[in-house]
Amino acid sequence: MARTAGLREPAAPLEKTPLETYVPPAKPSLIGLSRAELAARLGDVGVPERQQKMRVQQLWHWIYFRGARSFDEMSSVSKDTRTALAERFTVDRPEVVAEQISNDGTRKWLLRLPSGDDLQKAHEVECVYIPETDRGTLCVSSQVGCTLNCAFCHTGTQRLVRNLTAGEIVGQVMVARDRLNDWADRETPHGNRLITNIVMMGMGEPLYNFDAVRDALLIVSDNEGIGISRRRITLSTSGVVPNIKRAGEEIGVMLAISLHAVRDELRDELVPLNRKYPIAELLQACRDYPGASNARRITFEYVMLKGVNDSLDDARLLVKLLKGIPAKINLIPFNPWPGSAYECSDWEQIEKFSEYVFNAGYSSPVRTPRGRDILAACGQLKSETEKLSARERQALRAMAMTD
């Protein structure tokens, strides 16, 4: 997004810090807790029940509206309460250990988290900010690694390590606001926030971490805090059918489906989850999604793979399958990564595919690849806990030079 003179610029990029410098937090963070949970923590430090509702509102304002980094900043909270909270808790975010900035302005942060095991080894996830003229989109992760093994996705080459907590998911949004100077007391052009949209399209399958994702998104969308509208939050799933309806009922955000194929035999290969929840079952769940309408269309993501799923026959069957579903189709040029077995469809073929779908009555934008040179584009995220080999780094540089 364009910035004007005199406004606070985003913080400078960070250098990667060594894994062994990580020190696990000694105290739990209040980030990610519901109001009821915050009230319980206040009770733990001796705040009388009659004061808890007021104190919760104060904490909520300072943590999620103002982005306070310590209890000392919370000037409207009594000093005794601040001291008691600081002795037991923190408002720490995930640790930012590296930041990369693409030639197109996309930013990728590598975030370090405690592992939750006795060895206290750190885990890492990635979070990506994509600035555009009329919006700023933050791509958020829900798991360390992924269990789905989608054939075209870089994250799928990393084993699932663990689910993220609600606090670690919300923490990604807070880290991004920290790095972009995007809290309520900071100037931004025309009074708008730099982060306007959230997409749960980072590492992991959100619906396999349902409770934490739900709790995090309810906090992110709360009007008295971070305040990002649910209509500006999109949850993307590869098709965990039993939790799709739950997402509509309990979270109420926009839904995106990683479809990528129109025949079960091919989708079984590209998205192995299809063997459990085939296309017909998935699309029925979409038809039943609470709140779906022409004003709240379901997005179907379709990665364009040369000679694999990009024929006009595929386009025709796609249109047929989506009949009766308020939908739009995002066509995604395949973003290569070291060791990937696929090629991106030719641009002419992508345009033909898009034109056919559009003429059938569906919006079919072609997603502009962003952040390819820093492996931040769709399907390219992978925790640096699993290092790239020298050969992979060389391949990445070669691919970036040809874009």
Curated annotation (Swiss-Prot):
EC number(s) on file: 2.1.1.192
One Pfam entry name: RlmN_N
Protein location: Cytoplasm
Active site, per annotation: 126, 378
CDD domains per record: Radical_SAM (cd01335)
Reactions catalysed, as given in the entry: adenosine(2503) in 23S rRNA + 2 reduced [2Fe-2S]-[ferredoxin] + 2 S-adenosyl-L-methionine = 2-methyladenosine(2503) in 23S rRNA + 5'-deoxyadenosine + L-methionine + 2 oxidized [2Fe-2S]-[ferredoxin] + S-adenosyl-L-homocysteine; adenosine(37) in tRNA + 2 reduced [2Fe-2S]-[ferredoxin] + 2 S-adenosyl-L-methionine = 2-methyladenosine(37) in tRNA + 5'-deoxyadenosine + L-methionine + 2 oxidized [2Fe-2S]-[ferredoxin] + S-adenosyl-L-homocysteine
Disulfide bonds: 139-378
Record text on cofactor binding: Binds 1 [4Fe-4S] cluster. The cluster is coordinated with 3 cysteines and an exchangeable S-adenosyl-L-methionine.
Radical SAM core domain segment(s): 132-375
Listed PROSITE patterns: RADICAL_SAM
Residues annotated to bind [4Fe-4S] cluster: 146, 150, 153
Cofactor needs: [4Fe-4S] cluster
GO cellular component: cytoplasm
Binding annotation for S-adenosyl-L-methionine: 204-205, 236, 258-260, 335
GO BP term, pick one: rRNA base methylation
EC top class named in words: transferase
Example GO molecular function: rRNA (adenine(2503)-C2-)-methyltransferase activity
HAMAP family tied to this protein: RNA_methyltr_RlmN
PANTHER family: 23S RRNA METHYLTRANSFERASE, RADICAL SAM CORE DOMAIN-CONTAINING PROTEIN
Similarity field: Belongs to the radical SAM superfamily. RlmN family.
Protein name (Swiss-Prot/TrEMBL): Dual-specificity RNA methyltransferase RlmN
Organism of derivation: Bradyrhizobium sp. (strain BTAi1 / ATCC BAA-1182)
Upper taxonomic lineage: Bacteria, Pseudomonadati, Pseudomonadota, Alphaproteobacteria, Hyphomicrobiales
